Amino acid sequence: MYKFCANALKVILSLRGGVKVYNKENLPADSGFVIACTHSGWVDVITLGVGILPYQIHYMAKKELFQNKWIGSFLKKIHAFPVDRENPGPSSIKTPIKLLKEGEIVGIFPSGTRTSEDVPLKRGAVTIAQMGKAPLVPAAYQGPSSGKELFKKGKMKLIIGEPLHQADFAHLPSKERLAAMTEALNQRIKELENKLDQL
């Protein structure tokens, strides 16, 4: 179902020029990984999924969306899994860590600007990557952020950064490691956004 939906969306997006993807070779080919991409609307979630095909991403989605049996069933088929955003706890990271250890890809979408939600999400991406012993890949998207904007002119650009590897931070104590990796992620995402402005 995931592959079918992603390829169908790829065809639809191609009608407006498609998605230009830069540095796709930065995606790890030999392990699962966390990909943290800038977020301004639902379009960037779709763009990331289409842009890195044939890789398939597992997404976090708020648990309320799964309360409807049919919607919940569809979301599971396209690799979404429920998370309690109001009361996040240890159970919120069990699923993504398990997926990483199975060699799968987990997508997390901190916003592009430093909002109150942004820093915890980046820290969450780092925590999941560390506990899953997986690389953390920064990414940035630039283009339409809503369905209304999607059918207007304007490029859709996605850029993939070089992965952050756990080994590069292993010399630090655990608390410092979390802070250092979060700051490194933030810095790389900023650099990617600046590069997109020039492309």
UniProtKB/Swiss-Prot annotation:
- Please give an example of a GO cellular component term from this record: plasma membrane
Looking up Pfam families in the UniProt record yields: Acyltransferase
EC?
2.3.1.n4
Q: Name one GO molecular function term.
A: 1-acylglycerol-3-phosphate O-acyltransferase activity
Q: Pathway involvement?
A: Lipid metabolism; phospholipid metabolism
Keywords (A to Z) from UniProt: Acyltransferase, Cell membrane, Lipid biosynthesis, Lipid metabolism, Membrane, Phospholipid biosynthesis, Phospholipid metabolism, Transferase
Q: Which CDD domains does the UniProt entry name for this protein?
A: LPLAT_AGPAT-like (cd07989)
Query: According to its UniProt record, where is this protein located?
Result: Cell membrane
* Motif extent (HXXXXD motif): 39-44
Highest rank taxon of the organism? Bacteria
Question: For this chain's UniProt record, which GO biological process terms are given?
Answer: phosphatidic acid biosynthetic process
Q: What family name appears in the similarity comment? A: Belongs to the 1-acyl-sn-glycerol-3-phosphate acyltransferase family.
NCBIfam families given for it?
AGP_acyltrn
* Protein's job: Converts lysophosphatidic acid (LPA) into phosphatidic acid (PA) by incorporating an acyl moiety at the 2 position. This enzyme utilizes acyl-ACP as fatty acyl donor, but not acyl-CoA.
Q: What does the entry's domain section say? A: The HXXXXD motif is essential for acyltransferase activity and may constitute the binding site for the phosphate moiety of the glycerol-3-phosphate.
Q: What is this protein called?
A: 1-acyl-sn-glycerol-3-phosphate acyltransferase
Q: Which organism is it from?
A: Bacillus subtilis (strain 168)
Which gene underlies this protein? Answer: plsC
